[in-house]
Amino acid sequence: MSKSTAEIRQAFLDFFHSKGHQVVASSSLVPHNDPTLLFTNAGMNQFKDVFLGLDKRNYSRATTSQRCVRAGGKHNDLENVGYTARHHTFFEMLGNFSFGDYFKHDAIQFAWELLTSEKWFALPKERLWVTVYESDDEAYEIWEKEVGIPRERIIRIGDNKGAPYASDNFWQMGDTGPCGPCTEIFYDHGDHIWGGPPGSPEEDGDRYIEIWNIVFMQFNRQADGTMEPLPKPSVDTGMGLERIAAVLQHVNSNYDIDLFRTLIQAVAKVTGATDLSNKSLRVIADHIRSCAFLIADGVMPSNENRGYVLRRIIRRAVRHGNMLGAKETFFYKLVGPLIDVMGSAGEDLKRQQAQVEQVLKTEEEQFARTLERGLALLDEELAKLSGDTLDGETAFRLYDTYGFPVDLTADVCRERNIKVDEAGFEAAMEEQRRRAREASGFGADYNAMIRVDSASEFKGYDHLELNGKVTALFVDGKAVDAINAGQEAVVVLDQTPFYAESGGQVGDKGELKGANFSFAVEDTQKYGQAIGHIGKLAAGSLKVGDAVQADVDEARRARIRLNHSATHLMHAALRQVLGTHVSQKGSLVNDKVLRFDFSHNEAMKPEEIRAVEDLVNTQIRRNLPIETNIMDLEAAKAKGAMALFGEKYDERVRVLSMGDFSTELCGGTHASRTGDIGLFRIISESGTAAGVRRIEAVTGEGAIATVHADSDRLSEVAHLLKGDSNNLADKVRSVLERTRQLEKELQQLKEQAAAQESANLSSKAIDVNGVKLLVSELSGVEPKMLRTMVDDLKNQLGSTIIVLATVVEGKVSLIAGVSKDVTDRVKAGELIGMVAQQVGGKGGGRPDMAQAGGTDAAALPAALASVKGWVSAKLQ
């Protein structure tokens, strides 16, 4: 009996756990602290700093089932999804990793045992082929002599990409950094399927499918291209769960595995489709996975960066649902079936199900309003098309007006064998594309980063000053032995009370000092396991090995502690007032303010803001104890501790509790009791992206200062209105009513003046072929009065063409009016466009009335003078 996808995932993890590997949970799809990467796209992403020597773990062997997304940037599979057997936007990468522990021998033996042992995957040995890098004799011999694979099934792959080490079988993290040869394992589906072994001209066929890639990181590539052997070689492997499931379930397409069969049936049910072979079902089944998990990991649909990629995927799915005949919103209904089919890998998603469904539903409803009109416009353009390519300008117009991503337009065109001029589209939309598509590789030169082998012990929970020793100094990213007065540097100590920026809390400031020197610390940051004090040596000199006294700015730290504790109280209060869908999406805690981003689909009502504020202040008055406990991560989650979005946690974590009101994982610094906070006030609530709100708040002395400021403003307003704070609202209402009355009277006077001006103007009209033409520049007339004047003049003049202009603060306002009986010969929109072009502007409107603006007031007289000749030509 074949294993289910969930069973295969668990078997992989169980196998490597039995081989001494730590089972590590999948990291977020949003890479932590890695601006070089759009989405997590491989199992090794969360271990990148470990491989680079910037981070240390308490284990040297790990195994994961990592959620990955490839859509956008270098790894863009979107346009192929649904049309091929193995392309996905979302997939799970099974992997095992060695950080300086085992190397080639064990890595290969582990892979062979898992794949072929009757206890595990039990694949026929004769169906497995392998490739190795051309010069990797060690791997070749292990496969041949120890594993026993015949030579004809071991293929050496050289530099097949046009440069040294540019090979399918040589992996590198970037232009510099860790790299090394890899060996890949292929499964032969049999001669009933077309295709040849890897390295052959027919390798693109579907007969031989790569199922596992094992990378041997044994070199550090320098900027000049030289390869230095790594002191502790490592192993990074990746096997696509969906691919190995297809092999083990004896199907040739990933979309035929149990997971996708179930999802496809769910898609058919919510869309009303009956043909289960329809490619649109595959597209939607794939896309619900990437969309749901991206939203669960904090990405919201938007027009920038990750949010734009998410929006593209959602809209592509909705369009395919439209093709299947879906009559109402359907996409969000697939979140439940997805959770069911993902098993243990869907637990994070289940906790946020309501929020994910709401975001998908809202986005689909917004897009549905324009989808029909956009498709109609595209159909119209395709009907007019004489060749086989849609121009880029039309593709851009569809994006700009209807929100059609270009790949959605390309999808529609592809079904009709029509290409899209993507170069033309890119030219029209270069800036948007630059923002939306970030580089997706490991492009940063990590050799230039500060790398510290030593670790710093943080003692700032209990101390604000202590003595330490300088273990490293860096100037401009380079290690030095000493610094002198006036130099900016990063100072690393063996132990420190300074808190390094983490979890939204800013780094400490303060001073490092000794008998003959003073170093002003302006920021504190982490460098792997070391803590770096960033600042400037104010006096004296400092060298590695010197003893220092480290003093944190105590008053600043105290204000930060209050703000951080208030952030936890507010998070819990938001979940009580708004609902448990609220989860933290980001935060900033400094000594002046706390800023908190959270998931919520609409602006908070004033009464909700007040309720949160009151609830937090109630907890402050309760003077709850703030306690910390160190425990296992799983135990903390079982206790209900909330985790911070985007943070990485060790297996042992710090749990912060405030009585019975709040429990969160947190490594920051906090007050001793909630009463220390004193007072909490929300000063703003706003939106930052679709489905994400932001609150800014102040505490303690800062909150009291805002109370005083509000009181002072009220007193000032009361004084200006000659009242007091008790009757202030009545006074304001009275002033507003008087203002409205005066504005009404002023408007009446303006209309009377305009009517009089119109009467005076009518006598200036001239006759052009039986039509009255009036062209005039007016001074002292508001632009919005021009329309009223044109209406009056049309009533007075009968068959007429009118052009009026006025200049206010250097800006030209134009209006053209044409009586109905003349619009067959002269259209107001064309006339105003001709005039506006001459004054550096543009405009438009109906055939009988059109408006425009311009910036070149000096050109106005000549532009108005050109009207008579233009009109005369039209009326001939």
Swiss-Prot record:
Entry note: cofactor: Binds 1 zinc ion per subunit; it is not clear where this binding occurs.
Region span, Editing: 553-705
List of residues binding Zn(2+): H564, H568, C666, H670
Listed PROSITE patterns: AA_TRNA_LIGASE_II_ALA
Effect of C666A: Loss of mischarged tRNA editing activity
Essential cofactor(s): Zn(2+)
Enzyme class: ligase
Chain intervals for the UniProt region annotation (Important for oligomerization): 699-808
Localization of this protein: Cytoplasm
Pfam families from the UniProt entry: DHHA1, tRNA-synt_2c, tRNA_SAD
Assembly, per entry: Homotetramer.
Protein name: Alanine--tRNA ligase
